[in-house]
From Swiss-Prot:
InterPro entries reported for this sequence: Ribosomal_uS2, Ribosomal_uS2_bac/mit/plastid, Ribosomal_uS2_CS, Ribosomal_uS2_flav_dom_sf
Name of encoding gene: rpsB
Membership in a protein family: Belongs to the universal ribosomal protein uS2 family.
Designated name of the protein: Small ribosomal subunit protein uS2
Species assigned in the record: Methylobacillus flagellatus (strain ATCC 51484 / DSM 6875 / VKM B-1610 / KT)
KW Nucleus (keyword) present: no
Amino acid sequence: MSVTMRQMLEAGVHFGHQTRYWNPKMAPYIFGERNKIHIINLEKTLPLFEDALKYVRQLSANKGRILFVGTKRQARDIIKEEAQRAGCPYVNHRWLGGMLTNFKTVKQSIKRLTEYEALLQDGGIEKFGKKEALGYKREVEKLERSIGGIKEMGGLPDAIFIIDVGHESGAVTEAAKLGIPVIGVVDTNNSPEGVAYVIPGNDDSSRAIRLYARGIADAVLEGRNQSINEIVKAASEEEFVEVEEVAAE
């Protein structure tokens, strides 16, 4: 999927924050100001977003794992929906400290969640008293909200896509410690430091958030399809060679 300048304008990607909240490190991406609001230069944003999409396509074609992160109210549902559509892990409620740097402990919580879910599904919960059964159900809800989106992740991601790097500063810091590249939407009030693929843009508008998340999800699917097509092509070429060899004999 390719995104156009018009689509970005319609989604309000160019609207930054109030000028008094600006981060000077975002100066290269700012076009100017209007009514005390910074206007982001979409001539900078569009090629940078395309670079990010190209990277995601390549990573996905090589079977890389991309974690979607967006826990602010406007992003939660969109992040979950687009990540699920692309078959990617996601965090959309709250970033728990150590989610990456202490993944061993997180894996234990995931194990507990899957065990409790199995108990609920096969009716094993019924052997407990009402109060205890309710406790299990509440624990499942709590775990599902915080780590449900990463229970199939299996290991650390190869890259992280983040909406609002300021709001998700914990995720950016942990990714930097582990050398995991960050693809981040950076508004005019935040710093692009520590972000490998900067997408300068509005991080508050749900339309803009949808545009970024849909683009990344599409790139994941395109990369995966490219990988499958290459495998099929390679397999058919091998068969063709074998047929030729048999014919030669």
